[in-house]
Amino acid sequence: MEPLIELKDLEYAYPYASPALSNISLCIQRGEKIALVGSNGAGKSTLLLTLNGMIRPDKGTVTIYGKPVSYDRNSLRKIRQKIGFVFQDPDVQIIAPTVWQDVAFGPVNLDYSEEQVQQAVSNALHSVGLEGFEKRPPYHLSGGEKKRVAIAGILAMDPDVLILDEPTSMLDPAGSEDIMDLLDELNHQGKTIIISTHDVELAYPWADRIILMEKGRIIASGTPEEAFSDKELVRRARLKTPILLELSQELKSRGMKTPGTLPRTVLDIIRIIEHNHHGSIRLSDNGYGTIHVGDVDLISGSHIQAILARTSCDTIGVMGSRAKICARQWGLIPDISYAVIDKCILQAMNGRTSLILTTGGMVTRVFERVSMFNQTNNRSIPVRSLIGDEIPDDLSGI
């Protein structure tokens, strides 16, 4: 398969400074979730800036969609339409007096018709969960909301690739979770997502591929398990081993077996513990709890309220920007808003019933993830879809 982006033997140095990039070669495939991970000064941001032509390397070639980048104005304009860049500080990127005008900036400059601009802005704000924010001045927004405006401004141009430099910087934990959940949602819709970060706890469970950088060089590229299992490379990159991987290594050093792949979630750690107890751990005497899934575009708030009033539900989880907006509008306070599926699986293993609110293809993702877990671990956790106006007598039942 032809790479979406290919870098070959890149070299780059800022004026009067040591090399920022040295001998960089990299292929990026469509649909990947990639995290460039390294300490400050490792070259992450510089490398990201080469991916859509904002920096022209001193040596080497950048190939996008199979063609070498020529760096003329028209070529760069087309590239930046399809490969969007979100800066670390959204205040650098947000320039218009209202949210609508800022998100419309790209489509207007791409000569969209008035109708196309309206549709592009509407779709972008819907994607990031900022419907109703059109007339707000950006300086009245929170840090997380500004990040979403910056992302919406890129999405309005319908890019194939979304590049984000330190996407969770300056955000509190809840804001960080919201942004990473949004990136998961966009990737599920087909976008290629590339981020930079020094936060190994963020990158390890999220990325499909980790690229470790140190002093302008790529020192490792592989799955999160591969990249972070090499303690010497992690040390060279001035990083630390992710806590779940470190815990797994400590358990193994004490004689515990770690079947299958290395753990990337709490659910994986539970699997290791159960395996070493030969399946003797019983998390619940009442069997498995049921995971119910509701598509907020197909059911109403009154329907959900009626269900919760008549039945027992231990946990409410929301996945995706649209679902979070609906939950707020419906007066629901979710228990879980990040890593929702795995956390609801844990609840089900403990005999508790969960309700996941989400939209579209994310519904399918819930069923696929639970099915995969059941097959891999010889489980039979039930998943049910809430359909139309049907109100089950008991959510906890199968």
UniProtKB/Swiss-Prot annotation:
Q: Which GO terms describe its biological process?
A: cobalt ion transport
Q: What is its main location?
A: membrane
What PROSITE patterns does the database record attribute to this sequence? ABC_TRANSPORTER_1, ABC_TRANSPORTER_2, CBIO
What does the UniProt keyword field contain?
Answer: ATP-binding, Cell membrane, Membrane, Nucleotide-binding, Translocase, Transport
Among the entry's GO cellular component annotations, what is one?
ATP-binding cassette (ABC) transporter complex
**One example GO MF annotation:** ATPase-coupled transmembrane transporter activity
Q: What is its EC number?
A: 7.-.-.-
Compartments annotated for it: namely: Cell membrane
Subunit details: Forms a stable energy-coupling factor (ECF) transporter complex composed of 2 membrane-embedded substrate-binding proteins (S component), 2 ATP-binding proteins (A component) and 2 transmembrane proteins (T component).
Q: Tell me, what does this protein do in biology?
A: ATP-binding (A) component of a common energy-coupling factor (ECF) ABC-transporter complex. Unlike classic ABC transporters this ECF transporter provides the energy necessary to transport a number of different substrates.
Indicate what this protein is called per its UniProt record: Energy-coupling factor transporter ATP-binding protein EcfA2
